[in-house]
Amino acid sequence: MAAASRARVAYLLRQLQRAACQCPTHSHTYSQAPGLSPSGKTTDYAFEMAVSNIRYGAGVTKEVGMDLQNMGAKNVCLMTDKNLSKLPPVQVAMDSLVKNGIPFTVYDNVRVEPTDASFMEAIEFAQKGAFDAYVAVGGGSTMDTCMAANLYASSPHSDFLDYVSAPIGKGKPVSVPLKPLIAVPTTSGTGSETTGVAIFDYEHLKVKIGIASRAIKPTLGLIDPLHTLHMPARVVANSGFDVLCHALESYTTLPYHLRSPCPSNPITRPAYQGSNPISDIWAIHALRIVAKYLKRAVRNPDDLEARSHMHLASAFAGIGFGNAGVHLCHGMSYPISGLVKTYKAKDYNVDHPLVPHGLSVVLTSPAVFTFTAQMFPERHLETAEILGADTRTARIQDAGLVLADTLRKFLFDLDVDDGLAAVGYSKADIPALVKGTLPQERVTKLAPRPQSEEDLAALFEASMKLY
């Protein structure tokens, strides 16, 4: 393009930005200088994209030994869980390490839906092992546990709560160098191979909380679609719901230039920064894949095409939400999982009650997006259309209802439990669920619409039944 043409394009873009509608209901412009939030705090003016290197391909796990050899690794920790330790993904990884002469030790005591206690057990193992590299083979629980182990083994004098997000922890920035970590995801949901977030149940308060820092993200993610063929149908579905909500929430988070406070130093800019032009691309692309392939992936265990696309969608959504963030569906999901009573999800071989993360997230989605659509309704309507809604005659003020109805149909078609009541909760549990949501300000403050305790209670009540 000639210089004159480039200058003309730049001029036109500036004019469009200056003329952009400033109404918060109809505008989502990113061309904002620092300003003030409603609380009076200075808002941010920049966003930063951080993502792990990723390698995709059927059978790519067999390269992990060569990668570690190239890194000069001499003492590797391979983390997984007891169920997966008996399955092909772990065996393929171990065979590659053996073939390439990499000494390694297996830690297979990862807990599905980890707790602070299970994190600390893995951390102690890592500290004693003095490992110079890590391999995490598993779902989000394994990858999150491995990230935490790597962090605290690299910072052995730190207190456990030092890096845990506020208000429960101190939320200190990570300034120590970590060891290389290669993530091999075996589910299509969390996107942890691309993010610097490790989530766990803090049992003392019965809430989920996390460690969030770009510094802890895996060095490399090996996305091998062959690993998806071992997943039972409900694991595929619940993992896919996590992808769905990652995409929807990151696309509808508060824009980065409206988030406060503005950091005084780049190291304190949070991993979750609000929606931005780059995260938007990944979120929308992931959502289109979910709309096209999730039902196929659930219904046909041999549909490698559908399961391969969902494996990529997990990473794509991870890149999006790993930088933009999520909001109410995830913030409210943590007490839903953490306060579980007796519910045990189908297809999960665990010895404790379990509401899988993806299920806990999606059960509130119709209520949440009805609530948030007052802000940026055009984005809510756009996502409803991607998921199959006919929006040609829809009114912009009905965007939340349209998206909620579209989600209900999508979930009904995939045999999702009929709301929180179906997984063991009642109206009597709402105060505890609200209390468990309040510490999740790391994500809830990114919701496009502020929420009171009364709002949260109403959202939980509306989520007791879906259909």
From Swiss-Prot:
The gene is ADHFE1. This is Hydroxyacid-oxoacid transhydrogenase, mitochondrial. Its EC number is 1.1.99.24. It is found in: Mitochondrion. InterPro entries: ADH_Fe/GldA (IPR001670), ADH_Fe_C (IPR056798), Alcohol_dehydrogenase_Fe (IPR039697), HOT (IPR042157). The keyword Heme does not apply. CDD domains: HOT. SUPFAM superfamilies: Dehydroquinate synthase-like. It comes from the Eukaryota. It holds the Pfam family Fe-ADH. GO terms for cellular component: mitochondrion. One of its GO terms (biological process) is lipid metabolic process. Catalyzes the cofactor-independent reversible oxidation of gamma-hydroxybutyrate (GHB) to succinic semialdehyde (SSA) coupled to reduction of 2-ketoglutarate (2-KG) to D-2-hydroxyglutarate (D-2-HG). L-3-hydroxybutyrate (L-3-OHB) is also a substrate for HOT when using 2-KG as hydrogen acceptor, resulting in the formation of D-2-HG. Coiled coil: none annotated. GO terms for molecular function: alcohol dehydrogenase (NAD+) activity; hydroxyacid-oxoacid transhydrogenase activity; metal ion binding. Belongs to the iron-containing alcohol dehydrogenase family. Hydroxyacid-oxoacid transhydrogenase subfamily. The keyword Lipid metabolism applies. Keywords: Acetylation, Lipid metabolism, Mitochondrion, Oxidoreductase, Phosphoprotein, Transit peptide. The modification Phosphoserine is found at S452. It catalyses: (S)-3-hydroxybutanoate + 2-oxoglutarate = (R)-2-hydroxyglutarate + acetoacetate; 4-hydroxybutanoate + 2-oxoglutarate = (R)-2-hydroxyglutarate + succinate semialdehyde. Gene3D superfamilies: 3.40.50.1970, Dehydroquinate synthase-like - alpha domain (1.20.1090.10). Its main location: mitochondrion. The modification N6-acetyllysine is found at K445.
